[in-house]
Amino acid sequence: MLRWITAGESHGRALVAVLEGMVAGVEITSTDISEQLARRRLGYGRGARMSFERDAVSVLSGVRHGLTLGGPIAVEIGNTEWPKWETVMATDPVDPAQLADSARNAPLTRPRPGHADYAGMLKYGFDDARPVLERASARETAARVAAGTIARSFLRQALGVEVLSHVIAIGPSAPYEGPPPGPGDLPAIDASPVRAYDEAAEQAMIAEIEAAKKDGDTLGGVVEVVALGLPVGLGSFTSGDNRLDGQLAAAVMGIQAIKGVEIGDGFATARRRGSQAHDEMYPGPDGVVRSTNRAGGLEGGMTNGQPLRVRAAMKPISTVPRALATVDMATGDEAVAIHQRSDVCAVPAAGVVVEAMVALVLARAALQKFGGDSLAETRRNIDAYRRAVAEREAPAARGTA
């Protein structure tokens, strides 16, 4: 079973990702992880932190000479601002006099609407939102991207699967509804200021961000992740927790600020008749083919051989420059919410994080299906399965003769 967990706070010494259950022999380097983390910092509308934040990656265990060893993989991402926060975020007790002299340690008692501040303070008994926001911060997603980088390397090397994303819409801009991009389009997408696949959509998104920035506001949006090259049969119909669509939705909804997930055409299919909602099948030269992909590559909780399409809706960032009304938890008085350094829009970066979570779930499903202790063994199992599937589809291929 592939498992992952992260640790660390936004302004702590470092973030840590631990990935357990990865097979031996997968090629991965700290440079690969750094490149994906750099993609996470992309995007028009990011805040000042992105201009000086550098992700200092150290692979602590589970990899030797660029190959995974089969044991738990630990990745550390150092915080380059740690010297500024060393006293405030120290793990050992600190002299109260030192803390009293630090402006960074001022109590944060005015929770931000839409953030974890309020519920977290009440649930854990904190008088200050600092312990909540430090862990709830989207900075934690850097560790998820690190783990996801290893998963996507496994998917590429074991199955030839590619995972990519693009931004569909930002704020009220009209959503892009054209054909999804392919792996060859990813450099151009990453070169786009908003990681858009369509140039006209890109300009509309930039205009929305500029307007929100001028008004002291923030924006959300929608990203789409596409996974290409998946075999038929990852996931299962046998029980709800084995359904791949449920696993994907849970993983993506677990990302900070994500408020909605759909697979394929998702909610649009609810407004269609059945004859216009499903993907009809026909005999093809290599087996069954389809002319549409409304299901987004999943039927009955299993991959069906079509490209996987997952969309995620991100809410506007909770730290609004114009400051929203709240209650000071120390006094009970009306107040304006605390303001932490933040972005106007982080939707382009969210696409990279959703890629990582989709890759992790797909890698787990592939290892559950094909097993193996080494990449070579997993590949042998995959090859045997694909041959068996091709034999089962042979009658459909003969139907086109």
Swiss-Prot record:
GO terms for cellular component: cytosol. One of its GO terms (molecular function) is FMN binding. Keywords: Amino-acid biosynthesis, Aromatic amino acid biosynthesis, FAD, Flavoprotein, FMN, Lyase, NADP. It catalyses: 5-O-(1-carboxyvinyl)-3-phosphoshikimate = chorismate + phosphate. It is an enzyme of class 4 (lyase). SUPFAM superfamilies: Chorismate synthase, AroC (SSF103263). Pathway: Metabolic intermediate biosynthesis; chorismate biosynthesis; chorismate from D-erythrose 4-phosphate and phosphoenolpyruvate: step 7/7. This is Chorismate synthase. It comes from Mycobacterium avium (strain 104).
